[in-house]
Amino acid sequence: TFWSPNVNIFRDPRWGRGHETYGEDPFLTAENGKAYVRGLQGDGEVMKTAACAKHFAVHSGPESIRHEFNAEATQKDMEETYLPAFEALVKEAKVESVMGAYNRVNGEGACASKFLMGKLSEWGFDGYFVSDCWAIRDFHEHHGLTKNAVESAALALTAGCDVNCGCTYVNVLAALDEGLVTKEDIRKACVHLMRTRIRLGMFDDKTEFDDIPYNIVSCVEHKKVSLECAEKSMVLLKNNGILPLDKNKVNTIAVIGPNSNSRIVLEGNYNGTADRYITFLEGIQNRFEGRVIYAEGCHLYKQKVSGLAMPGDRYAEAMAAAENADVENLKIGEIASQLSLQRF
């Protein structure tokens, strides 16, 4: 299973995980999400991989209090904004898995919500439900929905959460002994999981996806499609006639900023490893025939780059680079892997 795509709605730029999503529009999110799921799961005799629609539901920040936050949404907001993408992925793309969110939704824990589970049933969901990691533990530690881990495990399992990412389900047998769950509850969850494994061909002697070599995964054709996707996805918010650069007038470009020559910034989070990385600086150096000046300018989140230096130890370098260039290319921002979950 790949715990992706993230089809939450992104409408506040302060949400540190917004870059994982498809943006603020429910329709566009649904369309992109469906294509992603179909690409992951394939259409062969066995399922290529199991995709996962997350985080169900109303998970769009604030990130710092996600473990105890109660998202209050009207029926109108649920139907028009927060649920359409999930519904489309279930009904049209046949997504194999759905992941519950950390937060509560109108008072109910998302991983044990009668309302949300009812929606999945209404849509004809035929896969398995998984909690976000340690979300079920939040029931008793942060949300106050239960008194202890045994009750939390029982609440989630009986509601329809088949898999617990975390350790709370080690208490399922204790819940069975206390009469909080039944053997049928456990059997039903196991059936859902085994059904997915069968669809993935895990019990077959051999499938068409067992031995795909890296030279196929990273072939020229695939790279061309990735490049086309990147080019068509870019949005130029403001130009004022600067681009494209006039080669006859521009002799020197200053590339400034802590993200200019960073390979980490290209990765995002929950990332794989590419066979090639080209930083912003390297890309400009490769394409521009004139002079390229580089200055780090500052640290991403510290007041200085060098440990023994005074604050702002790279400012003068950046100013000098800018003063000696015809065009300045500034790369600032944050690195996804270091975005603090304790912010908004």
State where each predicted segment sits:
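Glycoside hydrolase catalytic-domain context in secreted enzymes
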Residues: 1-344
